[in-house]
């Protein structure tokens, strides 16, 4: 799993640099980034007719889990009906779903991920010690 790409996609700086975003441009951005990460996919939709919604999924084979990044883009003009060319706010609401827990920032997600990695390492070391005893 490429954490640098996930960090970039969830950074405010990355999205602030984008201008004149609409669903078509958003799809292009996520299409490019899904090509950079193995085992990833995404879907876009008009959520309740009020938001452009993107769900970006990344499979982590090492930890045998999924990370889901959820993005909601609000239209610049809330009265305008959404279509593929409706301009949206470049700063989305972002949520990261990992092991059934929702994180609102990359930093809190990364802490949970590191804790999970450390626990996996401890478990593997314990198994290795048990296997060595069997020799």
Show the residue positions of the predicted features:
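Amphipathic, interaction-prone secondary-structure segments
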Residues: 28-86
């Amino acid at each position: 799993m490429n954490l640098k790409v996930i960090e970039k996609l969830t950074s405010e700086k990355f999205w602030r640099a984008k201008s004149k975003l609409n669903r078509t441009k958003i799809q292009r951005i996520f299409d490019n980034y899904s090509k950079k990460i193995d085992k990833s996919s995404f879907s876009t939709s008009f959520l309740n007719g009020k938001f452009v919604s993107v769900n970006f999924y990344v499979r982590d084979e090492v930890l045998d889990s999924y990370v889901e990044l959820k993005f909601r883009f609000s239209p610049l003009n809330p009265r305008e009906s959404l279509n593929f060319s409706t301009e949206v706010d470049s700063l989305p609401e972002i949520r990261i779903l990992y092991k059934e827990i929702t994180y609102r920032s990359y930093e809190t997600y990364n802490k949970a991920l590191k804790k999970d990695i450390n626990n996996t390492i401890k478990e593997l070391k314990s198994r290795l010690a048990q296997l060595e005893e069997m020799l």
